């Protein structure tokens, strides 16, 4: 099996009046002067609230410094001043080669999710048919969603498709840890 995700925990919200948004060409930044953004990591999903123009969910593309994130999605330039909150609501795993990458005819995959007893949120698989996918190329794979209920700690799903790439996506995460996501293709 391939490990898509080893261990990932929910992190606390970040709130600040010095957080701003900048769009320069095709680079989209969330920055601050003193509020630390260092807790966020590449592929984290952060939901922004309190802004005039950027209340949305963004995928971290690069952590440039403790005070600067580059995100995948388009931001609207907005200066600091009001209190903005960045809520860590999930993340996506690194991509793994699916059966379509190897031109396998059966397309059968099995995924295993393991979480701790305080985990809240959902995990699902996404696939892409693109050879070099962007965020927009991924789609949810039917029948792979696991919603944590604090009692089921391991869940599995089988799915079929000749996906070139597959990855896991965790959403609505408010607490707890995903211990691992494993896949067999």
Regions found by a protein language model. Name each.
Residues 1-12, 87-106:
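Transition segment at domain starts
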Residues 2, 132-145:
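Tryptophan-centered short beta-strand motifs
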Residues 8-42, 47-91, 150, 172-178:
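Small/polar beta-strand repeat architecture
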Residues 28, 107-111:
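Structural beta-strand segments of beta-rich domains
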Residues 32-34, 111-115, 168:
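Aromatic/hydrophobic beta-strand junction motif of beta-rich domains
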Residues 47, 122-126:
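Beta-strand signatures of extracellular beta-sandwich domains
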Residues 91, 97-106, 139-185:
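Beta-sandwich interaction modules
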Residues 126-132:
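Conserved Ser/Thr-centered positions that define the repeating blades of beta-propeller domains
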């Amino acid at each position: 099996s391939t490990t898509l995700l080893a261990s990932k925990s929910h992190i606390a919200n970040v709130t600040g009046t010095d957080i701003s948004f900048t769009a320069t060409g095709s680079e989209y930044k969330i920055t601050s002067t003193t509020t630390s953004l260092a807790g966020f990591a590449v592929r984290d999903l952060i939901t922004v609230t309190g802004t005039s123009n950027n209340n949305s969910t963004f995928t971290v593309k690069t952590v440039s410094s403790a005070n600067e994130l580059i995100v995948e999605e388009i931001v609207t330039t907005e200066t600091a001043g009001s209190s903005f909150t960045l809520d860590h609501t999930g993340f996506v795993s690194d991509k793994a080669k699916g059966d379509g990458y190897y031109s396998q005819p059966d397309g059968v995959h099995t995924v295993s999710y393991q979480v701790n007893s305080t985990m809240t949120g959902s995990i699902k698989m996404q696939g892409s048919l693109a050879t070099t996918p962007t965020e927009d190329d991924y789609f949810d794979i039917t029948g792979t969603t696991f919603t944590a209920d604090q009692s089921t700690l391991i869940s599995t799903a089988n799915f079929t498709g000749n996906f070139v790439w597959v990855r896991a996506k965790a959403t609505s995460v408010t607490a707890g840890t995903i211990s691992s996501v494993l896949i067999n293709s």
